[in-house]
Amino acid sequence: MARRRLPDRPPNGIGAGERPRLVPRPINVQDSVNRLTKPFRVPYKNTHIPPAAGRIATGSDNIVGGRSLRKRSATVCYSGLDINADEAEYNSQDISFSQLTKRRKDALSAQRLAKDPTRLSHIQYTLRRSFTVPIKGYVQRHSLPLTLGMKKKITPEPRPLHDPTDEFAIVLYDPSVDGEMIVHDTSMDNKEEESKKMIKSTQEKDNINKEKNSQEERPTQRIGRHPALMTNGVRNKPLRELLGDSENSAENKKKFASVPVVIDPKLAKILRPHQVEGVRFLYRCVTGLVMKDYLEAEAFNTSSEDPLKSDEKALTESQKTEQNNRGAYGCIMADEMGLGKTLQCIALMWTLLRQGPQGKRLIDKCIIVCPSSLVNNWANELIKWLGPNTLTPLAVDGKKSSMGGGNTTVSQAIHAWAQAQGRNIVKPVLIISYETLRRNVDQLKNCNVGLMLADEGHRLKNGDSLTFTALDSISCPRRVILSGTPIQNDLSEYFALLSFSNPGLLGSRAEFRKNFENPILRGRDADATDKEITKGEAQLQKLSTIVSKFIIRRTNDILAKYLPCKYEHVIFVNLKPLQNELYNKLIKSREVKKVVKGVGGSQPLRAIGILKKLCNHPNLLNFEDEFDDEDDLELPDDYNMPGSKARDVQTKYSAKFSILERFLHKIKTESDDKIVLISNYTQTLDLIEKMCRYKHYSAVRLDGTMSINKRQKLVDRFNDPEGQEFIFLLSSKAGGCGINLIGANRLILMDPDWNPAADQQALARVWRDGQKKDCFIYRFISTGTIEEKIFQRQSMKMSLSSCVVDAKEDVERLFSSDNLRQLFQKNENTICETHETYHCKRCNAQGKQLKRAPAMLYGDATTWNHLNHDALEKTNDHLLKNEHHYNDISFAFQYISH
């Protein structure tokens, strides 16, 4: 069968297969000229209808000569259709019905005008009216002025993001109770500064131009000047007036009623009552509600103290106070370790990023500054509490970032984060270490940061440090400091923290030292007079009244409801005979004598470090450098000198290592507990690690040599219940802050630190959220040595901290400043020198406790249980009960959480 041949080209509308016309048809010029020259004729002129006019061919007309013709379209004649009513009377036989129905009936027909004469005026009014867009059924339902330019955005009335009337809703801000919120907009301040700079620069340019023009002989007229009137005398409106005000201008902004702010329900379900209270406090501080109440109270107190004071002076002082504290929307979260400061700050940050009293978010960006070891921990916490893919942070740990791939440098990532605005902000939270931020702070210039969280904020204790200066230069009015120990050494450090979070709150540094620091310290001294004590207490009360509005402090006692019991012990250890002999030789050496006499060139810190190392183990010393005559030392014959190749550690020459060896053996053989061993010296960790290898104990170690990326993996491996490692060696300097080691329920701190905050941070690693077992914590202190002097100094600092932060005014004045200078004296005839300084009335002369304290206060060891060597047998800890058979422990303080 032959196949049908398809056409070589498709049909083009002219005909199937017909070639289209290639040459256009010529224009008939003559026809166009005739049409244009022809006189105009009114198409609807009133004329009489002729007898044959207007007739339309009917069906009968289509029959000619007995045959039917092809039907044609009806022929219509328009002449005579527009007639008067009088002329419309004619014989119905002459005009068919179809002619009557084809009469003109539009708006201009004479027939309709004859029926309604008022129609003409309506037509004229319609033609003269201004043109409008012919939209059928359009009704203007708004009162906005119709101006040139883009269509204005209609701002809807704000509404709360979450239902405040829900049964489990946690309302942070209620406008009916808290009043209107004064939001400090830093972006407007920057715009004002930029506009001032632009105005100043333009004025300078104008002055330069005027000087140039004055020097010329013929002054030229300024070109491009905006004339006040147009040529017709009408005022020449500027373009801004023609286009209307900007929708972001202050005059054009609509003032809506504030709406409640509610915590996200997914966070409200997991927050504990004390954490809800903390989030409320943080929100009121960073939104200015607390500052507003404080300024109102200050103004009221100023007027009520001296009614006769002139109004101008009172107004000046009030304005000065308000100016100093304008925009200082910060606070200090000083909860003790383990109370969930991280979760509370995440709830605050998430609320500010999502909600506000006007229905939109209050902040666009947030910076979290923390130690380098906690950068990844913060990122994990965000995912843990908010859920995956909810909020993507930019975590910068100093070497690489999570932005822009592997080729992006840290500086480029921070710069890109700072430049992002509006919808380009895909990672609103920057998590960065203190060191990295200090090096790259220039990248954050002109960047408006809504909130700054300074974790472990006691790093800002020095107001003159580079870290403090770098963070203070960032444009951020809302600053929150997280620190479990705000007072570490003195009130000056406390002032530095408050001046960072709330600049101007306590005046200048000199004013703070004069008004608060000096009177309080004089009153706290054991040798203070009654007048100094009274003045110190008055200033302490005044300081506490001010700072209590901007600092929140809760103790670990709250955790008793949620965590297992904690048993904390301060173990006073007797030195071994070899340690005692070497210690006496060191304190009698020429180096130590120079330190005691204050001779120039002496090194007190070096001498203190040598004595502290000896208290741990003699192998930590270098005998050649640290003893005057090494040959006079009477060392045992079997003693292995430092640097020997012996595989074992001679624990019998160190009391601390002897106790540690017995502790580890009991834990390994009688329980499934895990233990954390912490020291300030990596050399001590080396000896412990050597002992663990010899005993075949599986252990992991975290110190300053480990990279930041590997630390969190190591912590996760140790916390795994199925893991084989039961010993975690930790350097207090490298990982004492923020690391959660809840896989272990026992902890030993081998040596004390001068700073009580460092020890408190280290001791809080195991008793935290997620802990399932009872915790046992031990602090080793060598009896009668420099370590006990350090512990006494810590007690004085903790006493100072409790007075200012915890508002405990009844802490006993324990030590004189002169007693703390006697560091290099060893007390041979004591079981616990610290206990003797307490003058404890609950114990007899042998140190046996006769009655317990009414209540135990964690920061006050005078209220703890006091255990002499015989009392160890009755403790509920099987490790300490076993030590009753040995003479290494002379005394112990015991704290029980609940």
Curated annotation (Swiss-Prot):
GO terms for cellular component: cytoplasm; nucleus. Residues 188-220, 306-315 have a biased composition (Basic and acidic residues). Residues 1-22, 188-238, 302-321 are annotated as: Disordered. Its EC number is 3.6.4.12. ATP binds at residues 335-342. GO terms for biological process: chromatin remodeling; DNA geometric change; double-strand break repair via synthesis-dependent strand annealing; heteroduplex formation; reciprocal meiotic recombination; telomere maintenance via recombination. Residues 322-504 form the Helicase ATP-binding domain. Residues 659-812 form the Helicase C-terminal domain. Signal peptide: none annotated. InterPro entries: Helicase_ATP-bd (IPR014001), Helicase_C-like (IPR001650), P-loop_NTPase (IPR027417), Rad54_N (IPR013967), SNF2-like_sf (IPR038718), SNF2/RAD54-like_C (IPR049730), SNF2_N (IPR000330), SNF2_RAD54_helicase_repair (IPR050496). Induction: Expression increases in late G1 phase compared to other phases of the cell cycle. It is found in: Nucleus. It catalyses: ATP + H2O = ADP + phosphate + H(+). A motif (Nuclear localization signal) lies at residues 21-25, 41-45. A motif (DEGH box) lies at residues 455-458. It is an enzyme of class 3 (hydrolase). One of its GO terms (molecular function) is ATP hydrolysis activity. It holds the Pfam family Rad54_N. Keywords: ATP-binding, DNA damage, DNA repair, DNA-binding, Helicase, Hydrolase, Metal-binding, Nucleotide-binding, Nucleus, Phosphoprotein, Zinc. Belongs to the SNF2/RAD54 helicase family. Homohexamer. Interacts with RAD51; RAD51-ssDNA filaments do not interact autonomously with dsDNA but do so robustly in the presence of RAD54. Plays an essential role in homologous recombination (HR) which is a major pathway for repairing DNA double-strand breaks (DSBs), single-stranded DNA (ssDNA) gaps, and stalled or collapsed replication forks. Acts as a molecular motor during the homology search and guides RAD51 ssDNA along a donor dsDNA thereby changing the homology search from the diffusion-based mechanism to a motor-guided mechanism. Also plays an essential role in RAD51-mediated synaptic complex formation which consists of three strands encased in a protein filament formed once homology is recognized. This is DNA repair and recombination protein RAD54. It comes from Saccharomyces cerevisiae (strain ATCC 204508 / S288c). The gene is RAD54.
